[in-house]
Curated annotation (Swiss-Prot):
One of its GO terms (biological process) is L-histidine catabolic process to glutamate and formamide. The keyword Cytoplasm applies. GO terms for molecular function: histidine ammonia-lyase activity. Gene3D superfamilies: Fumarase/aspartase (Central domain), Fumarase/aspartase (N-terminal domain). This is Histidine ammonia-lyase. The modification 2,3-didehydroalanine (Ser) is found at S143. The gene is hutH. It is found in: Cytoplasm. InterPro entries: Aromatic_Lyase, Fumarase/histidase_N, HutH, L-Aspartase-like, Phe/His_NH3-lyase_AS. There is a cross-link at A142-G144 (5-imidazolinone (Ala-Gly)). Keywords: Cytoplasm, Histidine metabolism, Lyase. The keyword Metal-binding does not apply.
């Protein structure tokens, strides 16, 4: 993928593509003037002997310590070295690429006082697929993501290591792959690299992208379950949802109507049945999934804004010659957006688990117990449903909001923090749980449909059915179940059901 970056104009679709695959990045010339002006402003402050935080002072509680001109370069190198204190497993290439892209986008807006040479070095690393070692843990999301961004920056100054095509290389070798040599950071540049919400935002963006894929899958699986359970189409009638007026609900109901078309043989087979109302997990899908969609859309809006934000501190306002300390590094918007995504993921999984449970109950489903013939000898989906219940329960605990937590840091100078990285990365575990739940529902709904006398569903739902059956055959009798769940999960992880939903239903798709 080629991406020509106009600073401050990244879209969610751009970010999704950059997360999914390597990117060839170029920077629009419109960045040149503001970047150069901000550097000149910093140089003027030093030349005039003015005191400005982060340029010629210490950091955090040490902000009142004035640094001599002779030590300014050492100050910037020292902050990178000392702040690289993260722990845990290394972020994968996709996450590091996303972090670096977000950092380039922020720096290139020209409020950070950092030379184009440093920005170009980050771009060169991205284009050469050289990804610095960044540990997963160590940031509280204020003052920015200091530790992980320090690890990113180490490679630029010739320290630490980076991964290139799966191989870890010492920094000097990694820089050479990208045609670079170690940089000497000028005044303000180390702090500009370290300060910002780019890691928190990248964590939450990954959560958003996975949540979107799972939302699409849950909608399709929910439609398959309606068919397998001989559910009514009446609850998806547009008039019901227009009467309430909730946009997410209206859009989701339309998506279900698109899936559950009148051409379905399954639907025609029970047109004149005397069933009045279906259980809520079938009937209220537009209401529940619509509320989830609304939360996801709101979170996506916040994250797209943050992806284009300047979250450095202090900020350089070159036109006025001012350098002003503020708090844009505080990732509270990101933390709250991630918390809302967590609620949506928990509900998507919870609703799916309830549909699975319905299909297991022969009195509710009019299907063989646990979706298998010769019950007793065969146990069928009995324990697969238990697995789904375990995963749904796990997500209820993980959904607790991270943004309500705070611990003071830096000797109480940084006395309220966002915990946005925790809010974001827990979404990955939640998404994995939801994927497992939906894998069981997909398997179960297709098995249920196989019992419906060879009747076909709608074209789109039949496509979803074929996708699964190409990997997992019908259950004639009990067999080793876990590989089938894994096969379905891997299919879901590919986003293979996204195309079955209407275009632009989800923010980045």
């Amino acid at each position: 993928m080629s991406l020509h970056l106009k600073p401050g104009q990244l879209t969610l679709a751009d970010l999704r593509q950059a997360y999914l695959a390597p990117v060839r990045l170029s920077l629009d010339p419109s960045a040149d003037a503001p970047v150069a002006a901000s550097v000149a402003c910093v140089e003027n402050i030093i030349a005039e002997g003015r005191t400005a935080y982060g340029i010629n002072t210490g950091f955090g509680l040490l902000a009142s310590t004035r640094i001599s001109p002779a030590d300014l370069e050492k100050l910037q190198r020292s902050i990178v070295l000392s702040h690289a204190a993260g722990v845990g497993e290394a972020l994968d290439d996709a996450m590091v690429r996303l972090v670096m892209l977000l950092k380039v986008n922020s720096l290139a807006r020209g409020f950070s006082g950092i030379r184009r040479k440093v920005i170009d070095a980050l771009i060169a690393l991205i284009n050469a697929e050289v990804y610095p070692h960044i540990p997963l843990k160590g940031s509280v999301g204020a003052s920015g993501d200091l530790a992980p961004l320090a690890h990113m920056s180490l490679v630029l100054i010739g320290e630490s290591r980076a991964r290139h095509r799966g191989e870890w290389l010492p920094a000097a070798e990694a820089l050479a792959v990208a045609g670079l040599e170690p940089l000497t950071l000028a005044a303000k540049e180390g702090l500009a690299l370290l300060n910002g919400t780019q890691v928190s935002t990248a964590y939450a963006l990954r959560g958003l992208f996975e949540a979107e894929d799972l939302f699409a899958a849950a909608t399709v699986c929910g439609g398959l379950s309606v068919e397998a359970m001989l559910g009514s189409r009446a609850p998806f009638d547009a008039r019901i949802h227009a009467a309430r007026g909730q946009r997410g609900q209206i859009d989701v109901a339309a998506a279900y109507r698109d899936l559950l078309t009148a051409s379905s043989e399954v639907a025609r087979s029970h047109e004149k049945c005397d069933k009045v109302q279906d259980p809520y997990s079938l009937r209220c899908q537009p209401q529940v999934m619509g509320a989830c969609l609304t939360q996801m859309r709101q979170a996506a809006e916040v994250l797209e804004i943050e992806a284009n934000a300047v979250s450095d501190n202090p900020l350089v306002f070159a036109a006025e010659g001012d350098v002003i300390s503020g708090g844009n590094f505080h990732a509270e918007p990101v933390a709250m957006a991630a918390d809302n995504l967590a609620l949506a993921l928990a509900e998507i999984g919870s609703l799916s688990e309830r549909r699975i449970s319905l299909m297991m109950d022969m009195h509710m489903s009019q299907l063989p117990p646990f979706l298998v013939a010769n019950g007793g000898v065969n146990s069928g989906f009995m324990i697969a449903q238990v697995t789904a219940a375990a995963l749904a329960s796990d997500n209820k605990a993980l959904a607790h909001p991270a943004s309500v937590d705070s611990l003071p840091t830096s000797a109480n100078q940084e006395d309220h923090v966002s915990m946005a990285p925790n809010a974001g990365k827990r979404l990955w575990a939640m998404a994995e749980n939801v994927r497992g739940i939906l894998a069981v529902e997909w398997l179960g709904a297709c098995q249920g449909l196989d019992f419906r006398e060879g009747l076909k569903s709608s074209p789109k739902l039949e496509q979803a059915r074929r996708l699964l059956r190409d990997k997992v055959p019908y259950y004639q009798e009990d067999r080793f179940f876990a590989p089938d769940i894994e096969a379905a999960s891997q299919l879901l992880a590919s986003g293979c059901l996204n195309a079955l939903l209407p275009a632009r239903l989800l923010p980045s798709l």
